Amino acid sequence: MKPCVFTGSAVAIVSPFCGDGVDLEAFDRLIERQIQGGTDAIVVCGTTGEAATLSYNERMALIERCVRTVDRRVPVIAGSGTNSTASSIALSKAAQSAGVDALLTVTPYYNKASQSGLVQHFSAIADAVDVPVILYNVPARTGIGCTVQTYQALAKHPNIVGVKEASDNFDLIQDTLNLCPPGFTVWSGNDGSTAAIMALGGKGVISVAANVVPREMHELTQLCLKNRFLEAGALQLKLHELIRALFCEVNPIPVKAAMELLGLCSGELRLPLCRISERHLEQLSHALEPFRPAV
């Protein structure tokens, strides 16, 4: 049986900026807040962490800082996927050397590889490292998605342990859970689908919302893991308006704005991402109100 890197809620943590650089002191504070809030794992340098506009040195600084600050209290998962297999391998090796517990590798964007190309790409990354590799399927952002046949082929690799499924394609998710071996784990990649995917057999979520409400996302996944789905459904519904507001514009624009509204870190983004519109900021502020005592 393959190792399950984590069960529960892993935060796809934001990368706080200060001027032209990353704010590592603010990053430390965000990590501590996550651990105190019950977060089960931390994903650094993912989509929410604006990996696409980080330099290599910035990515490595954030990964190394996360490993050091977490200090083995929860698993650290580094986003190491790019649209270049060679670059992904180099970044994956460097992240492994920094001490991460696992890697999150997105489907290569823009190139629009065939399914055979995806199998070869992910296999080459997994061949190059010893830590577990989690696939990341998010076709709305990358322009290409994995099929269940691709998952079946990749599940045979000893280092490839599962997938962050952000397609919201429930036929694909159910086929994956039915047809891939039991040790191939599925995690939700969409906050709003967490309870539904876990009811089918998923083991948790890699969460944007956990940046704002870590305790609630942890509680939601724990209820699911304990098969208390009536209570989990009620909590999922309670979170619905907040989750919707966190995706009123492209991620991570709203969550960065939410972090600033709550005084947690700067809402600064890097172009081509820009600040949230006034209309959506008002929507977000309203959605945050029920959770302000909890943050």
Predicted regions and their residues:
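Short helix-capping segments at alpha-helix termini
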Residues: 68-74, 98-99, 129-131, 156-159, ...
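General structural feature for long, well-ordered alpha-helical segments within catalytic domains
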Residues: 23-30, 58, 62, 87, ...
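C-terminal alpha-helical cap/extension of soluble enzyme domains
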Residues: 8-16, 37-39, 199-202, 206-295
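Gly/Ser/Thr-rich beta-alpha loop segments that engage phosphate groups in nucleotides
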Residues: 10, 48-51, 81-83, 145, ...
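A generic alpha-helix structural signal
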Residues: 28-31, 63, 92, 122, ...
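Catalytic alpha/beta core domains of metabolic enzymes, predominantly
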Residues: 127-128, 139-247
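Active-site beta->alpha loop and helix N-cap motifs at the rims of alpha/beta catalytic domains
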Residues: 2-11, 15-143, 151
